[in-house]
Swiss-Prot record:
Keyword annotations: ATP-binding, Cell inner membrane, Cell membrane, Conjugation, Membrane, Nucleotide-binding, Plasmid, Transmembrane, Transmembrane helix
GO molecular function terms noted in the UniProt entry: ATP binding
Species, as recorded: Escherichia coli (strain K12)
Gene designation per UniProt: traD
PANTHER family in the cross-refs: CONJUGATIVE TRANSFER: DNA TRANSPORT
Transmembrane intervals: 28-47, 105-130
NCBIfam families: PRK13700.1 (NF010254), TraD_Ftype (TIGR02759)
Subunit structure: Interacts with relaxosome component TraM. May form a hexamer in the membrane.
Gene3D superfamilies linked to this entry: Magnesium chelatase subunit I, C-Terminal domain, P-loop containing nucleotide triphosphate hydrolases
Chain ranges on the Periplasmic side, renumbered to this chain: 48-104
Function: Conjugative DNA transfer (CDT) is the unidirectional transfer of ssDNA plasmid from a donor to a recipient cell. It is the central mechanism by which antibiotic resistance and virulence factors are propagated in bacterial populations. Couples the transferosome to a type IV secretion system. Probably forms a pore through which single-stranded plasmid DNA is transferred to the secretion system. The last 37 residues are important for determining plasmid specificity and transfer efficiency, with additional specificity conferred by the TraD-TraM pair.
Name of this protein: Coupling protein TraD
Family indicated by similarity: Belongs to the TrwB coupling protein family.
Length: 717
């Protein structure tokens, strides 16, 4: 409410102008309806009675009207009455008492009443129809006119009716919204911050997958899905630290050299900033060593780790001779080989957690498990799980397993009617899956249904790169956008939901003291606008999202309700690991990492030393050729030799000094020869070394870089 004179003047002028304009329209409508009423009455009378009856009836009612004035009229009028071709002459008194004339008057009156009722009803209907048409036209003039783009609705049942009308509604629903039939093979993307509701959507889809008996591979980072869905009779778990872990066999899983290469590509990912030589060399050594061990009857994960990390570099060189990896451990570049093995340590150390799982029953391979899919009965699920405190250590192995499962889909053969689900919440918490970009577009031919949850599109770009991330995101057709707090990410989500093209209506008023100046002008301008603003994305409550379906269907604002699920199994059961073997492997890893740190220092640029005036004078003398022998003598005087490449002579400590740095009880090859001495040294110097080794960050220690580059791709999220 405002008592400001300006506001009251403006409001009064506009109200007065509206009243005048409404009065004009009302007068025109009533005038037209009045004329229309009598036209209708005349038409009904013409249809209902004859002309003779109409005329005679009118004469009767005219005489009735003049009856009270008959005594005042000196000369009584005579009326000619038509009666079926005959003419009779009657005065007013005769007309009023004639039975035929009375009958004609009754017929005329009844016909007139009927005609008036019919005309009134028609006029009322006409009035409302005209009012609705005029109101609709006025509303259209004042509303935006949509000319293209996508629409937005907050009622999922409207979209459900559209899908049902088109015959494309599916039995799979997210809340009240059905997805498009068979669109599950076109993949899902769940985008939003933590705790917004992505896992709830995955659970809704997982319920349908369990009811239909579909095969499912699910990445469970926290154990929540194991707790709610694990069925030990048909399901499998892959978690190196879980007692229920299947006895996965690397050498039965990988039958050919390319299989080992693919496994190494995921186990040892390429960094985004580091020199790819180090990771690529580590991949080659791991793949070749594992391939050579396939025919060893005593092969095991412990032996594989020992071969790669424990034995001397000379023995590793002998083991890899006549293989493509032999060039990477040659004696001429031994220092580089030691650095490559240090890189290998960061990722292969995750394999040590697999030691002992071969005793967990029959050998298990993901490839054979997926080939055993049955369409006539319910299929099992594969849970690839971890927990928060061990995820960083298990990430290479988990990424490797998931990559094998993704490739295993192609080995199942083409079948569009089959459904194999891959649920991966928080996908960027894994290493880059190299085959995902190529396999995802083709997976629909094999019945693959991928459901990926990400916190932001920036995570995909950080892990996979700009172009690969765009390719992945483009093949995820059904999308749900939950809350994104940051402006940039929320703006991206708003753009992906879509925009509409419309003619935006505008209305302007002009008024003045003279009514001639009063007027209203309307117009429309073309405009493109996003369906939702980034602020709408930022302010979404939990369990509320915008869902976009493939095809010409509106975007839907969907609200979900959390559904509690009973606990059917423990999320995690610790597995007993051989402590002696674990201690030995920990010691080996400690030795290799210490060796890697020493080698890393050799590849760092030297800091120039401040020299005295004498040295400056000597340095101004012309340089003379220096023989290698003289150079060795001068190496003790503090002159630094730059480490510019792998072919240069690098200053190394004597082997005796290296042995002195190893803990007591550790041999030169890194093996534990005196467990009691080593454990005593641990208790005295490093009481918490075991815990530190388990949780050590996976840092590339072989190239000099900034501290910020030590983070794995995706660890910032």
């Amino acid at each position: 409410m405002s008592f400001n004179a300006k506001d009251m003047t403006q409001g009064g002028q506009i109200a007065s102008m509206r009243i005048r304009m409404f009065s004009q329209i009302a007068n025109i409508m009533l005038y037209c309806l009045f004329i229309f009423f009598w036209i209708l009455v005349g038409l009904v009378l013409w249809i209902k009675i004859s002309w003779q009856t109409f005329v005679n009836g009118c004469i009767y009612w005219w005489c009735t009207t003049l009856e009270g004035m008959r005594d005042l009229i000196k000369s009584q009028p005579v009326y000619e009455i038509q009666y079926y071709g005959k003419t009779f002459r009657m005065n007013a008194a005769q007309v009023l008492h004639d039975k035929y004339m009375i009958w004609c008057s009754e017929q005329l009156w009844s016909a007139f009443v009927l005609a008036a009722v019919v005309a009134l009803v028609i006029c009322l209907i006409t009035f409302f129809v005209v009012s609705w048409i005029l109101g609709r036209q006025g509303k259209q003039q004042s509303e935006n006119e949509v000319t293209g783009g996508r629409q937005l609705t907050d009622n999922p049942k409207d979209v459900a009716r559209m899908l049902k009308k088109d015959g494309k509604d599916s039995d799979i629903r997210i809340g009240d919204l059905p997805i498009i039939r068979d669109s599950e093979i076109q993949n899902f993307c769940l985008h939003g911050t933590v705790g917004a509701g992505k896992s709830e959507v995955i659970r809704r889809l997982a319920n349908y997958a369990r009811q239909r008996g579909d095969m499912v591979v699910i990445y469970d980072r926290s154990g929540e899905f194991v707790k709610s869905y694990y069925d030990p009779s048909i399901d499998k778990i892959l978690n190196p630290l879980d007692a229920r872990c299947a006895a996965w066999d690397l050498w039965k899983e990988c039958l050919t050299q390319p299989d080992f290469d693919n496994t190494a590509n995921t186990l040892i990912p390429m960094g985004t900033k580091e020199d790819p030589f180090w990771q690529g060399s580590g991949r080659t050594i791991f793949a070749e060593a594992a391939y050579l061990m396939r025919n060893d009857p005593n092969r095991s994960y412990s032996k594989l780790v020992d071969t790669l990390l424990s034995i001397k570099i000379e023995k590793l060189r002998t083991y890899l001779r006549n293989s493509p990896a032999a060039n990477l451990v040659e004696e001429k570049i031994e220092k580089t080989a030691i650095s490559i093995r240090a890189v290998l340590t960061n990722y292969v150390k995750a394999i040590r957690y697999l030691q002992g799982i071969e005793h967990n029953g029959e050998p298990f391979t993901i490839r054979d498990w997926m080939r055993g899919v049955r369409e006539d009965q319910k299929n099992g699920w594969l849970f690839i799980s971890s927990n928060a405190d061990t995820h960083a250590s298990l990430k290479p192995v988990i990424s490797m397993w998931l990559s094998i499962a993704i490739r295993g889909l192609l080995a199942m053969g083409e079948n569009r009617n089959r459904r194999v689900w891959f649920f991966c919440d928080e996908l960027p918490t894994l290493h880059k899956l190299p085959d995902l970009v190529e396999i995802l577009p083709e997976a629909r031919k094999f019945g693959g249904c991928y459901v990926f949850g990400i916190q932001s599109y920036a995570q995909l770009e950080d892990i996979y790169g700009e172009k690969a991330a765009a390719s992945l995101f483009d093949v995820m057709n059904t999308r749900a956008f939950f809350r994104s707090p940051s402006h940039k990410i929320a703006e991206f989500a708003a753009g992906e939901i879509g925009e509409k093209e419309h003619l935006k209506a505008s209305e302007q008023y002009s008024y003045g003291a003279d009514p001639v100046r009063d007027g209203v002008s309307t117009g429309k301008d073309m405009e493109r606008q996003t369906l939702v603003s980034y602020s709408d994305i930022q302010s979404l409550p939990d369990l509320t999202c915008y869902v976009t379906l493939p095809g010409p269907y509106p975007a839907v604002k969907l609200s979900l309700k959390y559904q509690t699920r009973p606990k059917v199994a423990p999320e995690f059961i610790p597995r007993d690991i051989n402590p002696e073997m674990e201690n030995r492997l920990s010691a080996v890893l400690a030795a290799r990492e210490a060796e890697g740190r020493q080698m890393a220092s050799l590849f760092e640029p030297d800091v120039p030393e401040v020299v005295s005036g004498e040295d400056v004078t000597q340095a101004e003398q012309p340089q003379q050729p220096v023989s290698p022998a003289i150079n060795d003598k001068k190496s003790d005087s503090g002159v630094n030799v730059p480490a510019g490449g792998i072919e240069q002579e690098l200053k190394m400590k004597p082997e005796e000094e290296m042995e002195q740095q190893l803990p007591p009880g550790i041999s030169e090859s890194g093996e534990v020869v005196d467990m009691a001495a080593y454990e005593a040294w641990q208790q005295e110097n490093h009481p918490d070394i075991q815990q530190q080794m388990q949780r050590r960050e996976e840092v590339n220690i072989n190239v000099h870089r900034e501290r910020g580059e030590d983070v794995e791709p995706g660890d910032d999220f």
